[in-house]
């Protein structure tokens, strides 16, 4: 659907049009007029003089000709620069560990007026009930929360145990929902390339909407074939030439800067005046601590401007206009007549200092959002209930037998990247030939009573203790890493007792833990409380060694088989390049 309007998302009644036209002509009173404001021109560069005239949800007019127009209320912007509301092109709200309601409270005052969300984390745990809850939240949100229908539940068939399926029939039931913009990331790219009919059926069913991609490092004929199938974008690019080639072949590029996957520095040099309509910004996975201390899409814009010298109008273009056009949300692309009045007023456009936010023509008050959060969450009817069908384990469950002189595969972590390397290490009577090797295990949590799948992990920086979590993409089984089997067992016990969550164990004791009662993924605490708890968890984790910046988010991707190179699922070690299971011992 790239760059074509979809009228499904821009419904305005004839009566609304008549009222809007009357205000545009100067024959009727506006609801709001924003005075003393300049509008950043995302098309030509430079600025447009205000004011901005608003009627209902929409902009009725822009420019000096409305200086004396009547309004019920006038907003003095005090010389601010106005830009369209920011849009996150791809994210999983669950990865913030906030509910959609809390996420809105945390991000809307920062100018994030629209999100394109794939709720496949909760769908992997709870199936269609999880998607239905996200749809309810989207329907009642002030923020424009659009949904892509999760396409790969589980991420890769036959490679892991997850909590539910999401069939094509169930997917089709949501296709025409007013908040649905398309099909979420098609992660099984080998299946698409090989022409598997079940995957092509999904693509065909959503072809009139937007088809999201997922193809880290893909190139050559395989990339050509993937694009031939109709995939329109990718958020997994992590190399400059990879991103350039995808743009050359007609893909739109989502430049991701999350809490674990940090690709902005690698890809930002690609952005220019010519290709910026095909470039977007996304976070994918960003935790509440970073949102509170650094920001969300606003933080990405700031870095484009300050660190990569991207011109103002181009930086704000890729943060709004490009994404709106890509998803057919043309009513959100500009501050212009007839567009939805999603407006961010900036006291400093270069520093992205947000002064005030309006959504659907109404000013946003952060304190009101916070005061209403609890009631709005209850109104959404969250799917509470314990999703951990797993008994505690003992240290003996993590026992691995090693033979001196033999070589064993090691999952090698790359800090702040989702990809891993597949290396090996030789075992001797004194241990492995590298001192950074620790243990990793994945335990299915959906009642199948499988023994833990165990492996070796290098490069994570864990010198002592253990970390455990039920946030483990995409099936969200229990993942635990540690230096001792006893501490690993204790960490697993704690997250089971919490009904899901995160835990740090050191010196034989639980140092910090965070319960996540909704699907083992999300908390019902406020954003501020969550940020404080995350801070405590990270502080406890740092005592275990020089870990990645976001150890729990990095750990969560160690079991995702659709990202190279070596991962561990509940079924065993998986080669993410050959897409086959492999053995711990290197025999070839």
Curated annotation (Swiss-Prot):
Its EC number is 3.5.4.2. Gene3D superfamilies: Metal-dependent hydrolases, Urease, subunit C, domain 1. Keywords: Hydrolase, Manganese. It is an enzyme of class 3 (hydrolase). Its cofactor is Mn(2+). One of its GO terms (molecular function) is adenine deaminase activity. GO terms for biological process: adenine catabolic process. It catalyses: adenine + H2O + H(+) = hypoxanthine + NH4(+). InterPro entries: Adenine_deam (IPR006679), Adenine_deam_C (IPR026912), Amidohydro-rel (IPR006680), Metal-dep_hydrolase_composite (IPR011059), Metal_Hydrolase (IPR032466). Homodimer. PANTHER family: ADENINE DEAMINASE (PTHR11113:SF2), N-ACETYLGLUCOSAMINE-6-PHOSPHATE DEACETYLASE (PTHR11113). Belongs to the metallo-dependent hydrolases superfamily. Adenine deaminase family. This is Adenine deaminase. The gene is ade.
């Amino acid at each position: 659907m790239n760059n074509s309007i979809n009228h499904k998302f821009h419904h305005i009644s004839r009566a609304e049009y008549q009222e809007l036209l009357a205000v545009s002509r100067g024959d009727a009173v506006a609801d709001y007029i924003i005075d003393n404001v300049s509008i950043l021109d995302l098309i030509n560069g430079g600025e447009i003089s205000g004011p901005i005239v608003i009627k209902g949800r929409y902009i009725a007019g822009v420019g000096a000709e409305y200086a004396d127009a009547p309004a019920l209320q006038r907003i003095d912007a005090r010389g601010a620069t106005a830009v369209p509301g920011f849009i996150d092109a791809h994210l999983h709200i669950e990865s913030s560990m906030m509910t959609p309601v809390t996420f809105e409270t945390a991000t809307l005052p920062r100018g994030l007026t629209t999100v394109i969300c794939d709720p496949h984390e909760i769908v992997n745990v709870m199936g269609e009930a999880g998607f239905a809850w996200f749809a309810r939240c989207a329907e009642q949100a002030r923020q424009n929360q659009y949904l892509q229908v999760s396409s790969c539940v589980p991420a890769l068939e036959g490679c892991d145990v997850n909590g539910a399926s999401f069939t094509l029939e169930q997917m089709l039931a949501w296709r025409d929902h007013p908040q649905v913009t398309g099909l979420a990331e098609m992660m099984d790219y080998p299946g698409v390339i090989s022409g598997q009919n079940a995957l092509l059926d999904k693509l065909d069913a959503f072809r009139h909407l937007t088809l999201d991609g997922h193809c880290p490092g893909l190139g050559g004929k395989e990339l050509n074939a993937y694009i031939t199938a109709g995939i329109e974008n990718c958020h997994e690019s992590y190399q400059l030439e990879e991103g350039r080639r995808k743009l050359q072949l007609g893909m739109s590029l989502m430049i991701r800067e999350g809490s674990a996957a940090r690709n902005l520095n690698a890809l930002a040099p690609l952005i220019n005046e010519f290709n910026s309509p095909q470039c977007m910004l996304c976070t994918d996975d960003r935790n509440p601590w970073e949102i509170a201390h650094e920001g969300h899409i606003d933080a990405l814009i700031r870095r484009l401007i300050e660190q990569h010298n991207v011109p103002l109008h181009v930086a704000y273009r890729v943060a709004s206009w490009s994404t709106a056009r890509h998803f057919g949300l043309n009513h959100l692309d500009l501050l212009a007549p007839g567009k939805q009045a999603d407006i961010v007023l900036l006291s400093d456009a270069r520093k992205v200092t947000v002064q005030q936010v309006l959504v659907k023509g109404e000013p946003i008050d952060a304190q009101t959002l916070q005061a209403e959060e609890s009631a709005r969450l209850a109104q959404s009817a969250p799917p509470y209930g314990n999703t951990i069908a797993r008994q505690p384990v003992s240290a003996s469950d993590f026992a691995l037998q090693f033979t001196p002189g033999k070589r064993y595969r090691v999952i090698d972590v790359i800090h702040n990247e989702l990809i891993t390397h597949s290396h090996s290490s030789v075992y001797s009577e004194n241990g492995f030939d590298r001192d950074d090797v620790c243990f990793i295990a994945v335990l299915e949590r959906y009642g199948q009573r499988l023994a833990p799948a165990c492996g070796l992990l290098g490069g994570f920086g864990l010198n002592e203790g253990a970390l455990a979590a039920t946030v483990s993409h995409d099936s969200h089984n229990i993942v635990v890493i540690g230096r001792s089997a006893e501490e690993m067992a204790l960490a697993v016990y704690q997250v089971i007792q919490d009904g899901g969550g995160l835990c740090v164990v050191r010196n034989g004791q639980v140092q910090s833990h965070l319960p996540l009662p909704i699907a083992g993924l999300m908390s019902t605490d406020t954003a501020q409380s969550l940020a404080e708890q995350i801070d405590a968890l990270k502080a406890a984790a740092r005592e275990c060694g020089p870990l990645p910046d976001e150890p729990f988010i990095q750990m969560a991707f160690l079991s995702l088989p659709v990202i190279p190179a070596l991962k561990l699922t509940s079924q065993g070690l998986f080669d993410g390049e050959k897409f086959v299971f492999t053995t711990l011992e290197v025999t070839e």
